[in-house]
């Protein structure tokens, strides 16, 4: 028994999740009436929902409070490229969802009371009201747009605080990130419960659309990595970007894939920049900053899963709303930085634009 526990601890999270998926499918087919297994999924999702608002508030506030002022002039270009790259990825995700719309099987029956917003004006009005929500109420009701807004305000205010106060904010962010890490560590059991619930209630056919959803996610990310990012690099460098792109993917991409955390990948990226001869004064700031605001993968995940929910519920999305969704996803993706799988916690931010019920 101890040997099994030891092997389990040494196994990476992706393999554990894979085992959880397989067990969920098998148990859903063999013993669909043991509904207590589905409780693992409910507890896992509940824990994520509970910690997510605090996670967003502390990480964004801490990132903004630590952002140094008066950097070299080329940092403006770097920041603009970060923001443009994230927005482009978000917009491509929306376009991919239009081309390949996916509808998912939901276990909830609360979709009949949905009142979709009537165009961009109503969406924008609702967005503004969420922005000025009471910060305590925003945390309690999981109003992520309000949480992001107040996190940005507090973060800017904390720039002028004492070092002791900033250290306290950093420690708070680290503690909450640690708690999130513990919850994410339980993902194999939670996903096993979620898969079991899906299979037990809907059968194997329910996995078809989730497989298509995964293909759409991966395809969009590959397109951004091999087409959009090289195009941006070409416009800046005026030369073939692919040798640099493939080198970065080889060194940094593999680590990023298995850690699923931009913060965890910072040391790898800094070593790569040093080896490539990049100015230390630039990459010492641009790499940590990019781990916060250059969140193309998170933006893709947020938008594709949001559009899947929207298509499932039959809500129409016009071009203006899609554009606003891309902007909101780009901004909210910053809240996913530093946490493995953190983008999944930010999906309600985008879904709230279209009055998608939180239970979905």
UniProtKB/Swiss-Prot annotation:
Disulfide bridge positions per record: none
GO biological process terms held by the UniProt record: serine transport; threonine transport
GO-annotated cellular components: plasma membrane
PANTHER family, alphabetized: PROTON/GLUTAMATE-ASPARTATE SYMPORTER, SERINE_THREONINE TRANSPORTER SSTT
SUPFAM superfamilies: Proton glutamate symport protein
Family: Belongs to the dicarboxylate/amino acid:cation symporter (DAACS) (TC 2.A.23) family.
Protein name: Serine/threonine transporter SstT
HAMAP family on file: Ser_Thr_transp_SstT (MF_01582)
Coiled coil: none
Function: Involved in the import of serine and threonine into the cell, with the concomitant import of sodium (symport system).
Subcellular location: Cell membrane
Transmembrane spans: 17-37, 40-60, 78-98, 138-158, 179-199, 212-232, 295-315, 316-336, 339-359
Family matches, as InterPro entries: Na-dicarboxylate_symporter (IPR001991), Na:dicarbo_symporter_sf (IPR036458), Ser_Thr_transp_SstT (IPR023025)
One Pfam family recorded for the sequence: SDF
Catalytic activity as recorded in UniProt: L-serine(in) + Na(+)(in) = L-serine(out) + Na(+)(out); L-threonine(in) + Na(+)(in) = L-threonine(out) + Na(+)(out)
One GO MF term attached to the UniProt entry: neutral L-amino acid:sodium symporter activity
Topology of the protein relative to the lipid bilayer: Multi-pass membrane protein
Record flagged with keyword Transit peptide: no
Keywords: Amino-acid transport, Cell membrane, Membrane, Symport, Transmembrane, Transmembrane helix, Transport
Species whose genome carries this gene: Streptococcus suis (strain 05ZYH33)
Domain of life: Bacteria
């Amino acid at each position: 028994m101890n040997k099994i526990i030891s092997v389990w601890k040494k196994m990476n999270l992706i393999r554990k999740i894979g085992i959880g998926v397989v067990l969920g499918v098998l148990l859903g087919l063999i013993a669909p009436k043991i509904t207590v297994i589905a409780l693992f999924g409910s507890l896992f999702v509940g824990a994520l929902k509970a910690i997510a608002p605090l996670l967003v508030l502390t990480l964004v506030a801490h990132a903004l409070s630590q952002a140094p002022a008066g950097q070299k002039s080329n940092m403006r270009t770097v920041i603009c490229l970060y923001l443009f790259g994230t927005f482009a990825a978000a917009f491509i995700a929306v376009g991919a969802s239009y081309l390949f719309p996916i509808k998912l099987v939901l276990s909830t029956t609360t979709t009949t009371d949905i009142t979709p917003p009537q165009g961009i004006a109503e969406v924008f009005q609702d967005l503004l009201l969420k922005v000025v929500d009471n910060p305590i109420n925003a945390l309690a009701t999981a109003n992520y747009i309000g949480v992001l807004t107040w996190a940005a305000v507090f973060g800017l205010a904390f720039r002028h605080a004492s070092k002791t106060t900033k250290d306290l904010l950093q420690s708070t962010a680290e503690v909450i990130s640690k708690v999130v890490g513990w919850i994410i560590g339980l993902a194999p059991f939670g996903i096993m419960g979620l898969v079991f619930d899906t299979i037990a209630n809907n059968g194997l056919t329910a996995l078809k659309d989730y497989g298509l959803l995964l293909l759409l996610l991966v395809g969009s990310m590959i397109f951004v990595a091999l087409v959009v990012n090289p195009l941006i690099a070409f416009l800046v460098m005026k030369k073939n970007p692919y040798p640099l792109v493939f080198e970065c993917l080889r060194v940094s991409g593999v680590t990023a894939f298995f850690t699923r955390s931009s913060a965890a990948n910072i040391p790898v990226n800094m070593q790569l920049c040093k080896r490539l001869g990049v100015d230390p004064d630039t990459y010492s700031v641009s790499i940590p900053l990019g781990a916060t605001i250059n969140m193309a993968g998170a933006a893709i995940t947020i938008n594709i899963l949001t559009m899947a929910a929207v298509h499932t519920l039959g809500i129409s999305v016009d071009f203006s709303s899609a554009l606003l969704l891309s902007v909101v996803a780009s901004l909210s993706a910053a809240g996913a930085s530093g946490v493995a799988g953190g983008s999944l916690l930010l999906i309600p931010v985008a879904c709230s634009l279209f009055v998608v019920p939180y239970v979905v």
